[in-house]
Amino acid sequence: MMNMQNMMKQAQKLQKQMEQKQADLAATSFSGKSAQELVTATFTGDKRLVNITFKEAVVDPEDIETLQDMTTQAINDALTQIDEATKKSLGAFAGKLPF
């Protein structure tokens, strides 16, 4: 059984590693796309929207609903990518906790 001091050292080490992984993730860009890639939403790994791009074909004043739907698809796609990357990157720490 580990003594308390070793457990604290291991926990601090894991915390630093986790903070680095979080910083790496925040510095990564994720681009979600709608059907036919007509709308692209780009986020940072900490879920900050940095850009939305609309291809000309999707901009129709007579059909705003399609633009809204495609924008929602692109945003949700990017957020799903971020969630998956977060689980992959930080999920490994759950099993390493010393307690």
From Swiss-Prot:
Keywords: Cytoplasm, DNA-binding. Transmembrane segments: none annotated. One of its GO terms (cellular component) is cytosol. InterPro entries: YbaB-like_sf, YbaB/EbfC. Pfam families: YbaB_DNA_bd (PF02575). The keyword DNA-binding applies. Belongs to the YbaB/EbfC family. Homodimer. Binds to DNA and alters its conformation. May be involved in regulation of gene expression, nucleoid organization and DNA protection. HAMAP family: DNA_YbaB_EbfC. This is Nucleoid-associated protein SZO_16661. It comes from Streptococcus equi subsp. zooepidemicus (strain H70).
